[in-house]
Amino acid sequence: MEKLLDLSGILDEETFHEYVSKRLDFPGYYGFNLDALWDCLRDLAMNNPGIQIRLEGLADFRSRNPDWAHKAIQCFLELEEESGARVLKFDDSPSGEGLIHDA
């Protein structure tokens, strides 16, 4: 199973949590914080052995949210390290699936 997260259009922490929770089908009680992200990612990996999460648009995500983006991305890297889930990282957005915002 592969899940795609194109983070190129993420403007802030709130947008990130809304987008990720929908794309990864997190439960309704998701807490919209990094602890809740970790808990739900871990549950996702445990319930879907061999899952692959494709992170795209990392350059744009980091440029808009430099400090916070590092912490969020770290959750995914730790997931890969601890659970065996595979996390693919792309600075660009080859899928073009990211959020679009009016300038």
Task: List where the protein language model places each region.
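N-terminal intrinsically disordered, low-complexity segments enriched in P/E/S/T
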Residues: 1-28, 44-103
